């Protein structure tokens, strides 16, 4: 599985849980391929804005996650192919953090790679 690569560099947002970078429209249409099981962004515009941030630094194109030293360095081996922010600013809302906690996903703001905590 892979995420759609953004066609335009304007109006992009990064997932606050896994750092995947996509347009708002893509998050609404497809959800977050790494986090959809816990965030449920697909079809929910308000949740897309709550769980993503337009404030991020740098991007990494992850195409060979298991072979790339950059993906290993950024702990992205278990994520889908796609564009990822190097760092994301923002915090998930308290109700989302509570949901994650009830699912056994520990969330600390500004820490990378939560998505591997709930992968099977």
UniProtKB/Swiss-Prot annotation:
One protein family per Pfam: Spt4
UniProt feature coiled coil, ranges: none
Region (Interaction with spt-5): 1-39
Compartment list: Nucleus
SMART domains listed in its UniProt record: Spt4 (SM01389)
Residue spans crossing the bilayer: none
C4-type zinc finger span: 15-35
Keyword Zinc-finger: yes
Keyword entries, A-Z: Activator, Metal-binding, Nucleus, Repressor, Transcription, Transcription regulation, Zinc, Zinc-finger
GO MF term set: RNA polymerase II complex binding; zinc ion binding
Top-level lineage group: Eukaryota
Cellular component aspect of the GO annotation: DSIF complex
BP GO annotations: regulation of DNA-templated transcription; transcription elongation by RNA polymerase II; transcription elongation-coupled chromatin remodeling
Subunit structure comment from the entry: Interacts with spt-5 to form DSIF. DSIF interacts with RNA polymerase II and with the positive transcription elongation factor b complex (P-TEFb complex), which is composed of cdk-9 and cyclin-T (cit-1.1 or cit-1.2).
Purpose of the protein: May function as a component of the DRB sensitivity-inducing factor complex (DSIF complex), which regulates transcription elongation by RNA polymerase II. DSIF may enhance transcriptional pausing at sites proximal to the promoter, which may in turn facilitate the assembly of an elongation competent RNA polymerase II complex.
Similarity annotation: Belongs to the SPT4 family.
This protein's name: Transcription elongation factor SPT4
Gene: spt-4
């Amino acid at each position: 599985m892979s995420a759609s690569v953004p066609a335009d560099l304007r109006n992009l947002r990064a997932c606050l849980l896994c750092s995947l970078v996509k347009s708002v429209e893509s998050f609404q249409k497809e959800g977050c391929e790494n986090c959809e099981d816990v965030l449920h962004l697909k079809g929910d515009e308000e949740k897309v804005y709550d769980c993503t941030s337009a404030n991020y630094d740098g991007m990494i194109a992850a195409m060979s996650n298991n072979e790339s030293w950059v993906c290993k360095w950024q702990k992205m081996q278990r994520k889908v192919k796609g564009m990822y922010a190097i760092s994301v600013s923002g915090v998930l809302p308290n109700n989302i953090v509570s949901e994650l906690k009830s699912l056994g996903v520990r969330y600390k703001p500004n820490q990378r790679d939560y998505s591997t905590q709930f992968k099977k």
